[in-house]
């Protein structure tokens, strides 16, 4: 009897899932028709009246800038009841709506059928939305076998014709998904978040609230949004277009899709894509109500992971910004002092004292004959008068809950408009940045440090996370499995020794696969001596040798003669590239005005990557492509860690050769890197055993390994710019005597090392050029 009941329940669920797939198929067809009719776009399904005013009360009203009464003790008692709303950022009505959906679709039949353990989502995370869009594009080609048992169907129709599609959802931030023009115009992510939440507050008049926010009356539209989202694979741009077409906020509506995915009808083949910050930051996961418990997490481009976690949890502020913040805070406090109640007045005074203390310390550093950069003791930042009486916990909570930054920034904008002051471009609200920094100062991580850096007439203060282990640990411990993937993950030791140092080796699996190209499509070689015999030693003490730099130029010209089409040369830094180019521009003795650059230009046109190119990078790439397509060939002088060293594909004739000049070690003399290595050494020393001498030796080796790994990850990224598909072919030349060291070669990708082993004999530059000519001869250009 029980078996029959279970079978009937399963049959009913299967039929509903088939009906859902049929409905999604109809929507897919409908969307395809809409794409064909882009010249005549259809009206939105639900036309909403959008308030075209500023969204703020009139300028004569001052109430909008007044802080709500704040009682830290009372608010602390209420915190637990408000926690869900505060964390998620949803209005009460929207929370009720989403909770009702969750209850509506959470059928008890799940437990009866026993499918709950099979409800595994895949969270696919990458660095940028463009990379996630590439993944979505590939996902559209995937055809998965159906998880619906055909024997449970009672339909008379041919159920095999109903194909079960991959359930995919793209998540993004408000900044990426907001469709409210007035909110989008704020530009800054923190300001957009604050304004979005403000437009949902109970005290906001109905006509001033965001017209796109889902409400209790929008249940049908949210279901419709869900079906359109799941009908086809959509990237972040598609989600925004869908929200605009339907007149509903895609940020909040997509969260409802995530909640619906707990529903038994959507149990199979669920993939959620999201960028790094939404997964790696606890506050972002809380805001999305995102749980990864017992799910699979895949992180692509994982060579960036450790740096990404540290950067997400780091914040930088300048002295000039602190001074601006102080001016804004004091102006606001003076203007509204009669209307600010006791707690607000007290906390604002505390913030002014704290910011003044930080400002004064930075001024003292700027005025002293100190190095250009160094570490800062947090206690020195809080040494101002009365700062020691501040309760860090209460002030942190006040900063997060009072909306002070939003109120002050709004008042500043109001004054600008009132005085008819306008900037050519909107500036980032400085109070949000100050707030982020103060929160770091109030709650510093044991793995974090503070640094200063003098820059011209200003000085910046940075809180930097040195160790990402604990921030990533919660994800590792919650997830069913964590997969780190990348084309160039080598060297791997940092992941084992630092990111996963607390995990037993038996729980860690590493896989390294060969390249898609056959071995004969790659030639990789080190180059120690130039065509004139100079030894290439680009260490700090030897890299400025003009003789060596001139020989490097002649060698590059020789290699460019042997390598067809496009060659990309990567240098350790912009400063060193400028130094080399300056020497290459000098007339050569006895060469009748000839320069190294003119020798190279006989073979290929030369293009340069600048330090602050920004959007001009695309123009440079287009010029590089046009030059190669014209048959001239081109040499692109670039920098390791620059715009062109990562994320740009130099496939086919755009990258027939990659030259790596020197080893791009980070500046070991910088305060940041000294602190990083010191932290690694101390952590290793504390966890090691044996004699004092052995522990110190192990710690020093760990610091050296960590330093080398940072360099070689950057090198491997540059190498990976060429050879982008199975029919591609290219030459990789690493120019520096240190590339012949076993410890350096051991950190190269396996497919590079295999090619080097086949050509293990050291070759002079002229012989290597001959090898390159033979390699490229007879190959059909692509």
From Swiss-Prot:
Cofactor(s) required for function per UniProt: [4Fe-4S] cluster
Localization terms from the record: Nucleus
An example Gene Ontology molecular-function term: DNA binding
Function noted in UniProt: ATP-dependent DNA helicase important for chromosome transmission and normal cell cycle progression in G(2)/M. May have a role in changing DNA topology to allow the loading of proteins involved in maintaining sister chromatid cohesion in the vicinity of the centromeres. Has a specific role in chromosome segregation during meiosis II.
Record InterPro entries: ATP-dep_Helicase_C, DinG/Rad3-like, DNA/RNA_helicase_DEAH_CS, Helic_SF1/SF2_ATP-bd_DinG/Rad3, Helicase-like_DEXD_c2, P-loop_NTPase, RAD3-like_helicase_DEAD, Rad3/Chl1-like
Listed GO CC annotations: chromatin; nucleus
Domain (Helicase ATP-binding): residue spans on this chain: 1-352
Recorded catalytic activity of this chain's protein: Couples ATP hydrolysis with the unwinding of duplex DNA at the replication fork by translocating in the 5'-3' direction. This creates two antiparallel DNA single strands (ssDNA). The leading ssDNA polymer is the template for DNA polymerase III holoenzyme which synthesizes a continuous strand; ATP + H2O = ADP + phosphate + H(+)
Protein family per UniProt: Belongs to the DEAD box helicase family. DEAH subfamily. DDX11/CHL1 sub-subfamily.
Motif (DEAH box): 300-303
EC number: 5.6.2.3
Alphabetical GO biological process terms: establishment of sister chromatid cohesion; interstrand cross-link repair; mitotic G1 DNA damage checkpoint signaling; mitotic sister chromatid cohesion
Keywords: ATP-binding, Cell cycle, DNA-binding, Helicase, Hydrolase, Iron, Iron-sulfur, Isomerase, Metal-binding, Nucleotide-binding, Nucleus
Annotated residues for binding of [4Fe-4S] cluster: 178, 196, 210, 249
Disordered: annotated span: 23-66
Protein name as it appears in the record: ATP-dependent DNA helicase chl1
Cofactor binding: number and manner: Binds 1 [4Fe-4S] cluster.
SMART domains per record: DEXDc2 (SM00488), HELICc2 (SM00491)
Record carries keyword Metal-binding: yes
Binding annotation for ATP: 80-87
Enzyme class: isomerase
NCBIfam families the record matches: rad3
